[in-house]
C-alpha cells in the first residue's frame, strides 16, 4: 500500500480555533492585538496575522496594561493567568480544548497530592503551560520526562499514586517509547 501525504497539510482543530480567535479579534477590535507566543508554528500564517496587526510576544511584560491579549493554542500557566488578571488585561483564551483537558487533569493530580509525570519537550510553550498548572504545596511533584533516559533517572516517592500526561502534540511513537 502506498500512502501519499498532502502538502501542505492542514492544522489541527485547536490551532484552527486559535487562528480564528485572532482573526475575529482583529476584525472586531482592530489592531493592535497582542498574542502570547506564536499562535501556530507556521511562518506564513504568523506573518499574515502580523501584517494585519497581531503583535506576538513571549511574555506579558512586553505589553502595556489594559490591552487585549490572546493566549495561544499552547495554553499558559496559572502564574500567567494571575499576572494578566492583576494587570487588567483583556484576555481571550485560545487554548486548545485538548490542552485544557490536560491542564485540568494536572491540576486535579496536584490537588490530590499525586506525583505526575509530563511526557514532553522542555521549553515548548505547551509544556511550560502544563507544568504551571501544578501546585506542589499539597506534597506532590510534577516531573518532565523527554525520553527513556529521563525515565531511568526518575525517582518518585509513591509509584502507586503516580499519574502521567503527555504534551498533546507528541507523536504516538515518541510517547510509547517513553511509556513502554
Curated annotation (Swiss-Prot):
<comment type="function">
    <text>Catalyzes the conversion of 1-hydroxy-2-methyl-2-(E)-butenyl 4-diphosphate (HMBPP) into a mixture of isopentenyl diphosphate (IPP) and dimethylallyl diphosphate (DMAPP). Acts in the terminal step of the DOXP/MEP pathway for isoprenoid precursor biosynthesis.</text>
</comment>
<feature type="binding site">
    <location>
        <position position="74"/>
    </location>
    <ligand>
        <name>dimethylallyl diphosphate</name>
    </ligand>
</feature>
<dbReference type="GO" id="GO:0051745">
    <property type="term" value="F:4-hydroxy-3-methylbut-2-enyl diphosphate reductase activity"/>
</dbReference>
<feature type="binding site">
    <location>
        <position position="74"/>
    </location>
    <ligand>
        <name>isopentenyl diphosphate</name>
    </ligand>
</feature>
<feature type="binding site">
    <location>
        <position position="96"/>
    </location>
    <ligand>
        <name>[4Fe-4S] cluster</name>
    </ligand>
</feature>
<dbReference type="GO" id="GO:0019288">
    <property type="term" value="P:isopentenyl diphosphate biosynthetic process, methylerythritol 4-phosphate pathway"/>
</dbReference>
<dbReference type="Pfam" id="PF02401">
    <property type="entry name" value="LYTB"/>
</dbReference>
<feature type="binding site">
    <location>
        <position position="124"/>
    </location>
    <ligand>
        <name>isopentenyl diphosphate</name>
    </ligand>
</feature>
<dbReference type="GO" id="GO:0050992">
    <property type="term" value="P:dimethylallyl diphosphate biosynthetic process"/>
</dbReference>
<keyword id="KW-0408">Iron</keyword>
<keyword id="KW-0004">4Fe-4S</keyword>
<keyword id="KW-0414">Isoprene biosynthesis</keyword>
<feature type="binding site">
    <location>
        <position position="74"/>
    </location>
    <ligand>
        <name>(2E)-4-hydroxy-3-methylbut-2-enyl diphosphate</name>
    </ligand>
</feature>
<dbReference type="GO" id="GO:0046872">
    <property type="term" value="F:metal ion binding"/>
</dbReference>
<protein>
    <recommendedName>
        <fullName>4-hydroxy-3-methylbut-2-enyl diphosphate reductase</fullName>
        <ecNumber>1.17.7.4</ecNumber>
    </recommendedName>
</protein>
<keyword id="KW-0411">Iron-sulfur</keyword>
<dbReference type="GO" id="GO:0051539">
    <property type="term" value="F:4 iron, 4 sulfur cluster binding"/>
</dbReference>
<comment type="similarity">
    <text>Belongs to the IspH family.</text>
</comment>
<feature type="active site" description="Proton donor">
    <location>
        <position position="126"/>
    </location>
</feature>
<keyword id="KW-0560">Oxidoreductase</keyword>
<dbReference type="InterPro" id="IPR003451">
    <property type="entry name" value="LytB/IspH"/>
</dbReference>
<feature type="binding site">
    <location>
        <position position="41"/>
    </location>
    <ligand>
        <name>(2E)-4-hydroxy-3-methylbut-2-enyl diphosphate</name>
    </ligand>
</feature>
<feature type="binding site">
    <location>
        <position position="12"/>
    </location>
    <ligand>
        <name>[4Fe-4S] cluster</name>
    </ligand>
</feature>
<keyword id="KW-0479">Metal-binding</keyword>
<feature type="binding site">
    <location>
        <position position="124"/>
    </location>
    <ligand>
        <name>(2E)-4-hydroxy-3-methylbut-2-enyl diphosphate</name>
    </ligand>
</feature>
<comment type="pathway">
    <text>Isoprenoid biosynthesis; isopentenyl diphosphate biosynthesis via DXP pathway; isopentenyl diphosphate from 1-deoxy-D-xylulose 5-phosphate: step 6/6.</text>
</comment>
<feature type="binding site">
    <location>
        <position position="41"/>
    </location>
    <ligand>
        <name>dimethylallyl diphosphate</name>
    </ligand>
</feature>
<feature type="binding site">
    <location>
        <position position="168"/>
    </location>
    <ligand>
        <name>(2E)-4-hydroxy-3-methylbut-2-enyl diphosphate</name>
    </ligand>
</feature>
<feature type="binding site">
    <location>
        <position position="41"/>
    </location>
    <ligand>
        <name>isopentenyl diphosphate</name>
    </ligand>
</feature>
<feature type="binding site">
    <location>
        <position position="124"/>
    </location>
    <ligand>
        <name>dimethylallyl diphosphate</name>
    </ligand>
</feature>
<comment type="pathway">
    <text>Isoprenoid biosynthesis; dimethylallyl diphosphate biosynthesis; dimethylallyl diphosphate from (2E)-4-hydroxy-3-methylbutenyl diphosphate: step 1/1.</text>
</comment>
